[in-house]
Amino acid sequence: MLSILLENPLLVLFLVAAIGYPLGRIKIRGSSLGVAAVLFVGLAMGSLHPELKLPEIVYVLGLALFVYTIGLSSGPAFVASLKREGIRNNALIIGMLLVAAGLVVGAQRLLGFKGTVTAGLFAGSLTNTPALAGALETIKHIASPELRELLLAEPVVGYSVAYPMGVMGVVLAISLVQKLWNVDYGEEGKRLRLAGTASEALRSMTVRIAWPGAGRHTVAELARHEKWDVIFGRIRRGDSYLLTGPQVRFQPGDLVTAVGTETELRRVAAFLGEVSEEEITVDRSEYDYRRIFVSNPRVAGRQLGELNLFENYGATVTRVRRGDDDFLPHDDMVLELGDRVRVVTHRDHMAEVTAFFGDSYRAVSEVDILTFSLGLALGLLLGIIPIPLPGGITLKLGFAGGPLIVALILGTIGRSGSMVWSLPYSANMTLRQIGLVLFLAGVGTRAGYGFVTTLAKGGGLAIFAAGAVVTCLTALATLWIGHKLMKIPMSILIGMVAGLQTQPAVLGYALEQTGNDLPNIGYASVYPVATISKILIVQILLTMLM
């Protein structure tokens, strides 16, 4: 059997993926390794024979795909995180990552770890695969050819031993702190919703206009003056229907449909009149609605307000669904391939509006090879450019940092002329998963034999203990400083801690604890900065310690 595996690396790749992926979904006390289990299966497979390893191009390709797709989807969130409280939140995260780096260096000095193992310890205790990738890239550039294979295995040892506690330690820290501080997530959620911080599910409501002064202002003027965060749909005026547009004026007695959060809809209804139990959307004889896929490249990457839907088609978009989330469609919202827009328009115009957006499921399942390859090539080129740092240190972003930074920029831009940089949501997630599996399987098999050899020499327990200390102290310090000194609500803060770890398992635990979506706000606001910072820090650590 071993000889068959040695002669068929492609078989090894898919065996590792097929065994590792389901293992990663097994939960123990609410936590699981996720796709990282592929790494451990790869290590086990590679430990069987020194030549049982996948070609280097496998993990390099996987790495490039993984970080590039992350960057494309995180670009807008990254830019948004630099505004308002995002600057404060990201400053805390960067500070804590520097603290973690200091703790790792202290462990290295105290316990005598190699610089390469220390870099893996940093990536594992903070459960960040791109950081491990960045470490491996740096070693490839600075290590001598005869030592390269041996040195490439050492960060994986540190990462693999520290990783499990990198998940469990944070969960334990959150559990301990919320009990000590008697955190009431339900009450905190209510308070934040009143302050307009929380994200609630969207719903529709029928409002009966009773305010006598409604006709003195257009809908756009009212929404701007009262700062309403809702979208108005159709109006029933007597026995006739019309669609709400920016210049439409409500009249007393109108029945109007509105889409928004429960809190905001109640506020609008109290101002304009009262909530009505009538469902005017049931009558679809004149105005109809449907969800339409955005598959037209000429629409993707453009702001919704630029499309002039009401003026050109007499249509209004009341919701945009991206992935599994619904968003209110404001004029400055940039549409992406794969978005599903809910459109209300006259039945006679529905076919025309549908053709305008595209509505082709097949089209949104495909990838624009030109823009995808060009963007990835630009990222790889950036990654090989040496960047001089103070102290004579030269930094290269490598196959991890280069594509990530370029993808963040392109994901924010959305399109350049006729070229759409973003990927359809489904295609992005598929390529991301494939890339991550390729990377983990490749790294695991290539480091497996060295992993076993290193552990056989001793030192595994010391790495595990050091990783546990780094993880727990960093998480506890973040929670204490964030909540006690910076007054960040715990519901958001534990999401930020999950973002600090770039760990979906911790985010899942946080969501279970709060019972609302507030942790998602903290997670999304710091994830891109945390990922980039870890990649840069781990490369600086390696350059200093090797």
From Swiss-Prot:
Membrane topology field: Multi-pass membrane protein
Superkingdom field? Bacteria
- Which intervals hold domain RCK C-terminal? 189-274, 275-359
Transmembrane region(s): 4-23, 30-47, 57-79, 91-113, 155-177, 372-394, 399-421, 434-456, 460-482, 489-511, 521-543
Cell location: Cell membrane
Keywords in UniProt for this one? Cell membrane, Membrane, Repeat, Transmembrane, Transmembrane helix, Transport
Pfam families, per database record? Asp-Al_Ex, TrkA_C
Q: Name one GO biological process term.
A: potassium ion transport
The main location is: membrane
| This protein's record includes keyword rRNA processing | no
An example molecular function term from Gene Ontology annotations: monoatomic cation transmembrane transporter activity
Q: Which GO terms describe its cellular component?
A: plasma membrane
Q: Which family does it belong to?
A: Belongs to the AAE transporter (TC 2.A.81) family.
Q: List the protein's name.
A: Uncharacterized transporter GSU1016
